[in-house]
Amino acid sequence: MTVPSIVLNDGNSIPQLGYGVFKVPPADTQRAVEEALEVGYRHIDTAAIYGNEEGVGAAIAASGIARDDLFITTKLWNDRHDGDEPAAAIAESLAKLALDQVDLYLVHWPTPAADNYVHAWEKMIELRAAGLTRSIGVSNHLVPHLERIVAATGVVPAVNQIELHPAYQQREITDWAAAHDVKIESWGPLGQGKYDLFGAEPVTAAAAAHGKTPAQAVLRWHLQKGFVVFPKSVRRERLEENLDVFDFDLTDTEIAAIDAMDPGDGSGRVSAHPDEVD
C-alpha cells in the first residue's frame, strides 16, 4: 500500500497518513515503529516530550528502508523556546533519532503566557536555513498565534498539527489554513475514545455503504478534507486497518453528514486549550 503525498507550501511533499507515537512507552517504541514500517507506513510523528525518539531512531536504522523514502517529524517542547534553546533541542532530537535532518520540525505548543513563541518561530526559520529540518511548522496554534508569527517574520508555517475529529473540527483554524496554504495535520483523529464516533449514524452509515469499519470511514473523512492524519495503535491488525483507506471515496452527502457532527460550541475538545498550556 502506497500512501499518497500532498505538497506543502515550501514545495516539499508529505505522506497524508502517518504513524504517531504519542503515549507509546519508550520500551515499546522500537518494535511498534518497526511493525508500522513493515505494514507500510513511511511517515512517523514523534516529539521530544514523548521520550521515545531513540526508539524511533532505532526502528529506522533496523528497517533498512532508504532515508529518502521516510518522512520523520519531531517537535520543540515548551521549555526550549528561549535564546538558542531551539538549536540545542533539535540537536538533541537528531542525536536520539540518529539522523542528520528531520523532514518536519514543529513548535509543539505556543505557550502564550511565556510570550516567546514568536522568538521560537524565528529560530525555527534559522534551523531550516541550516539544513537541520526540511520543513517547519507549528502544532496547537490558534489563529491569533498564527497571525502574529506570520506578521513578525513573513514566513507561513507549512503545517499546523491540531486536535481534530468529527466532533471537534476547529473550523476557524482550518479556514485560516486553507486561505494561507497551510496543511492541517489531525491528531486524535478518532476522538481519543471520549466520543462514540463509531456509533454515530453518519459514520456507521458511511462505513456500511462502503464495506468499511467506522474507523476507516472517519479516517477517509479526514483524508478527503485534505488533512494529514495520525491514527495510533500498537496492534498490527489495527495498523493494517488504518492504512486500508485509499480504495474508496465518501460521497459529498456522507461528508456533509459527518461535518454536521460538530456541535460548534467547542465541547468536543479533549486536550487542554492552547492558551492555557505552559
Swiss-Prot record:
GO terms for biological process: L-ascorbic acid biosynthetic process. Optimum pH is 6.4. Active over a broad pH range. Its EC number is 1.1.1.346. Keywords: Ascorbate biosynthesis, Cytoplasm, NADP, Oxidoreductase. It catalyses: 2-dehydro-L-idonate + NADP(+) = 2,5-didehydro-D-gluconate + NADPH + H(+). GO terms for molecular function: aldo-keto reductase (NADPH) activity. This is 2,5-diketo-D-gluconic acid reductase A. It comes from Corynebacterium sp. (strain ATCC 31090).
